[in-house]
Amino acid sequence: MALASQLSVTDDSAYGFITTNAEIVSKKRKLAQNDDRFEVVMSVYSPKADSMDVGVSVLKLKTLELTLMSFCDSSTFVRTVNQIQVYEPTSIILPEAQSHSQIEKLKYIIHSNISDKVRERFMKAKVFNAFDGMNSLKLYTDINESTLGQVISNRKLSLAAANACIDYCVSTKMFRVTNKIRLKYCMCENTMLIDTCTVRDLELVDSLSETGTTLYSFLNCCLTKMGMRILRTSILQPSTHENSIILRSESLQELINDEDALISIRSSLKHTCDLEKVFSTFLEPRGLLSQEQEINNIILLKTVLQNTFVIRKSIQNVSSHLLVQVKQILEHENVQHLLAIINEYIRNDCQWANNSTELANQRANAVKSGVNGLLDVSRRIRETLLEEVSELVAKLSEELEIFMEYRFEISRGFFIKIKGNNTDINSLPEVLINRVKKRKTIECTTIELMKQSSRYNDIVSEITTLNSTIIHDMYTSINSYTPILLMVSEAIGTLDLLCSFAYFTSLQKDSYTCPEFAKEVTIMRSLHPILGGNNSNFVANNYSCNHELSRIHVITGANMSGKSVYLRQIAYLVIMAQMGCFVPAEYARMRIFNSLYSRISSDNVDINASSFSKEMSETAVILNDSDGDSLILIDELGRGSSLTDGFSICLAILEDLICKEATVITTTHFRDIAQVLANKSCVVTAHMQTVETNGQLEMKYNLVLGRNDIVGYGIRFAEVSNLLPQELIEDSKVVANILRSRKPVHGDKELKLLSRRRKLVLELYFALNYISKLNCDMNYKMQLLQTLQSKFVEEINITPNTE
C-alpha cells in the first residue's frame, strides 16, 4: 500500500549553426541510456531470539521508494532469499558479528545466495533501532505522524531495518537529507513463496541453457519497461489473494473480448518510455544536472503527460474494476494541473532534444515569451548578435571570394569553416587568424568574430541565469507532484501487463481458459504452455486433486516418457493462474497455493548429473518448510542412491509429506512405491503410458491411472541408444529375468484387498458430498449419481470382500 499522499522543443534559429562542446554532448547522451540498473539498498534484520521473524527494507535510490516488509521465515530463510531475488539489491545491510547463532546463520545464507557484484555491508547492532527508524520516517516522508503510526505500528523489525538502510545511505552520501521518501508497505503473506531452487529448476526468469525459453520470455509481450518489471515480479511472487487474482482475470477477459480496444491500447503504449526513470529525475538534487538536461527532462515529462491523455482515451469505455482504477489514476486532476504548469512556461512546439544542437537551442528558447521581460530582451539581443555574425561572415566571404560557413562552440566561440582540399592554408588573407587544417576543411576566425563571441557568451550567460531561476521554480513545483507521477507509472505498467496477457492469449493456437478457484483442483486437457504451443502433436493431460482422496500423485514410467515435462506443466499452470493469466486447458479449477517447491531433473542424460547429497539437502528444506498449503513437485525421488536405500528414503519422504497434508506430485522408477502407497486414502498412482509394439517401446505421453506393467524399459532404452555393445545388452536381459523370477511377493493379499475396498467407500463418500453441494439442475445431479453408482458397483464387485 502506497503511503504517499496524493497532491493537491525549440524554435530553431534561422541560422542553425550552433553546436556544443564534447562535455555537453556526453551529458546529453546519458539521457538516452536504457540501463535499468541503479542503486537498490536492502537492509535485513532478525532479532536475537529463537523466533524466525525477519524485517526487510528496500530503498530504490533512483525513485526514492522505500519498501518495508516483515514476515515469519523458515529456518533456512527461504522467503528472505526470495526477496533478494525479487528486488535485486546492489547493496545489502546486515548487523555486525553477533554471538547469536540465528543471526550468523542468516548472514551465511544470504552470503551464499548472492552474486559477487552485490556489496555486503555490516553495521553496528544499535543502528537497527525501531524507535530511530520511526523518527527517520517522520523526517524523510511527508506523511503525517498519526497516519504513519497507524500503518506501520507494531512493525518494529521493518522499522529497525529501515533505520539502518537510511543511515547507511545518508552516511555514504547516496541519499541527501533534503530528499523525501515515498513509502510502501509490502504484505508478503499475500504472495506465493517460490524458493531459489524452484526458480532455477523451472527456468522462470533465467534459462539453464543459452538458447532455452523461460516462462518470463515466453509470456513477455509487454511494450513498456514498467510492464516488464511487474511481469517479472508476478512470476517470482504470484498472488495468493483470490480477489486480486479475479480482478486481473476480469480485466483480461474484457480486453480479450474487445479486440479493437486491445489494439488501441497497445498502440498508445508503444512509444511510452520508462516512466519510473523519467519521473525519478525530478527527485535528484539540483546541481547534479546541467541546465540543458533539466530543460530536456521537463520537455520529456510534458511528452509523457500528453501521452497519458492518448492512453486514457483508449480505455475510456472500460468497465472492469482494475481497468477503471487505471483510468481514474490517469484522469487524476493533478496530472492535468502538472501539464498546465509546464505549458505555462514551456513553448508548445518544444520537443525532446536528440542532439547537441537542439540542446543548445532549447537552453535559449524553451521558455515561453512573456514569462520574464528581461529574458525576452536578452533573447532579442542574442538574435540580433546572430544576425550580425551572419552578415559579417557573408560580407567577408564576398570580399575574399571564398565560400565560408560559421559555427559556434562554447570553448571556442564563433569560427569560420572553409571547405576545399586544394586551398593552401598559408595563402589565406591575414584577416583570417588562428588557422587550423582539419581533413577537407580549414577552420579560422577573425578579430571581429572573437569580439562577437565575447558579447554572445555574455548574453547567453545572462539568458542561462534567468532560465535557471524559472527552471528551478518548475522543478520545485513538479517535485511536489511526484507521488501521482509514480502512481501513473504503476498504473500504466499494470495496464501494459494486462494487455500483454490478453495479446499473448489471442496469439495462442490452443485454447486458453480463465481458471476458477476452489479447494479442489480439476484441470482438463491441459498443455505445457511453452512446449504445447510449439508442437501441434503435443498430448494434452488431465490433473485432479482432492485433499482427502488424491493430494499425493505417484507417477511411474519409462525414461523420456514425459514425466518431467508433466511436472513442469503443472507448475507453470499454477503460477500462471495465480498471476491472473489464462491457462492452456479446456477447463481449469485451481486451488491457491501459498508456496511452491520443485526438484526436477532433466530427461537429457548428457546433462542430468545430480548428486545424492545435493538432492537430500534440497529435500530437507522442503520437508522443513512445507505445509498443507504447499505444492511440491519432485522428479525421480531417491535416484541418487542404491536400490534399497533409495527405495527406503523415497518411501519415508512420501510418508512424511502425507502427514504434512501437502499437495505432492512425484515421479519415481521405484515401481513398488506405487504399490505400497496405492491403498493410502490420499494417494493416487499413475504412469505415463507406454505401448510395446514389435518389441519396441512407443511413448504415448499420456498420463494413465494405475501402475505401469511394462518392465525392462531401462535396458530397452540402453539398447535403442546404441551406447552399449549388443552382447552386454543381451546378458543384462538374462540377469534381469533371473532377478525378477526370484523376487518374493511381499504383503498380505487379503489386507491389500481390504484396504482397496475401504478406499473405494471413502471415495464414494467424498463424491456424494461433492455432488450434494453442486449448484446445478436436479436432472443433471441424478445423471451424476447414476454414473457414480454404476462405477462404484463395478469397482467394488471386482474387489473381493475379505471381512
From Swiss-Prot:
Disulfide bonds: none annotated. The keyword Cytoplasm does not apply. InterPro entries: DNA_mismatch_repair_Msh2, DNA_mismatch_repair_MutS_C, DNA_mismatch_repair_MutS_clamp, DNA_mismatch_repair_MutS_core, DNA_mismatch_repair_MutS_sf, DNA_mmatch_repair_MutS_con_dom, MutS, MutS_con_dom_sf. GO terms for biological process: mismatch repair; reciprocal meiotic recombination. GO terms for cellular component: DNA repair complex; MutSgamma complex; nuclear chromosome. Keywords: ATP-binding, DNA-binding, Meiosis, Nucleotide-binding. Pfam families: MutS_II, MutS_III, MutS_IV, MutS_V. One of its GO terms (molecular function) is ATP binding. The keyword ATP-binding applies. Gene3D superfamilies: 1.10.1420.10, MutS, connector domain (3.30.420.110), P-loop containing nucleotide triphosphate hydrolases (3.40.50.300). ATP binds at G557, A558, N559, M560, S561, G562, K563, S564. Heterooligomer of MSH4 and MSH5. Involved in meiotic recombination. Facilitate crossovers between homologs during meiosis. Belongs to the DNA mismatch repair MutS family. This is MutS protein homolog 4. The lineage of its organism: Eukaryota, Fungi, Dikarya, Ascomycota, Saccharomycotina. The gene is MSH4.
